[in-house]
Amino acid sequence: MSARRRLLRLWGAIALALWGAYLAVVLLLPDTAGARTAPTAPLAAIVGAGLVGLVSWLVLALDRPTGTVARALAHRLPWIVFGGGWFLAWQLSTVKSGLLDPPYFVAPEVLIADLVDDWTLLATCLMSSGLLLLTGYVIGSVAGFITGLLMGWSRRADYWLHPLLQTVGPVPASALLPLAVLVVPTTYLSAAFIVAFGAWFPMATMTRAGVRSVPKSFIDVARTLGAGEGFLVARVAIPSALPDMLTGLFTGLGTSLAALMTAELVGVDRGLAWYINWVKGWADYPRMYVGLVVLIVFCRALMVLLFKLRSSLLAWQQNLVRW
């Protein structure tokens, strides 16, 4: 028996046992008195479907333990086991025993029920956050690209702009929110400005560094062949600086998300951060957790998309770290 087959059988058995035990606890173990409860049918259906999917995946993987399906499952099985243990402990410590005091801690089925109840408002808040982030992030990234390109290519522009970048850039975007509210005409535009500022500094810094690091031999060869300034910038400097620019986009997305969370607390009346703060004000902690979960999924999806774009644009680069 191959080592991978043994690994799949061991971890697969543990995963099935944990998730099976979790399903049994949800359906068979009585709830403690005083705990907040909700219908368990949706949760049981999700876990049951997951168990069927896991069994099917295991059968396919064990049939061809050296194949792609088996490698993918072997890579994910420890996390599947960890998830089963986590949910089992979560269920036992909340609604089944009351070890963790309500209303601060509730069982997963309560979160599912709150998600279903609030899905319309959450969808509206998600779209609002996405639009605000897109507006600010695009504006800030474009401004950072132009600023960094000017500083990297022109010494005169670098003389004037680099001190400004060094002075203003490190200031946290959230610290400028009171000033933005005073100067910018509307609160929504002030929130977009804060998000844009969060993206501008990393993009400008990395673009400048990338353009400055273009090998001089590339430029000399292009000039020898008759290339003008526009060609040198568009066909030599920018492609060569692309890895650094994408790093700036990645870093800028993180700072923009942080700025977005702050801006939504005072600048808009819809958004994921607004929703989380609103339900927290009513001491509705389960809905607060639901908002946090949606926010986490939203942020992860954006990071995955950006890294997919990076991997596609830099497919030629050796030893590229994949997401």
Regions found by a protein language model. Give the residues of each.
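Short cytoplasmic-facing helical segments at TM-TM junctions of multi-pass membrane proteins
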Residues: 159-160, 202-249, 272, 276
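Transmembrane-helix boundary motif in ABC transporter permease subunits
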Residues: 60-66, 135-165
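Transmembrane alpha-helices
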Residues: 193-197, 230-263, 290, 306
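Periplasmic/extracellular loop-to-transmembrane helix junction in inner-membrane transport proteins
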Residues: 28-42, 92-139
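Transmembrane alpha-helical segments of polytopic membrane transport and secretion proteins
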Residues: 1-24, 32-37, 46-81, 307-323
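Generic hydrophobic transmembrane alpha-helix motif, especially the helices
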Residues: 165-202, 209
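Glycine-rich helix-loop "coupling/hinge" segments at transmembrane-helix boundaries
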Residues: 182, 210, 258-295, 314, ...
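C-terminal transmembrane helix and the adjacent membrane-cytosol boundary/short C-terminal tail
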Residues: 56, 212, 243, 247, ...
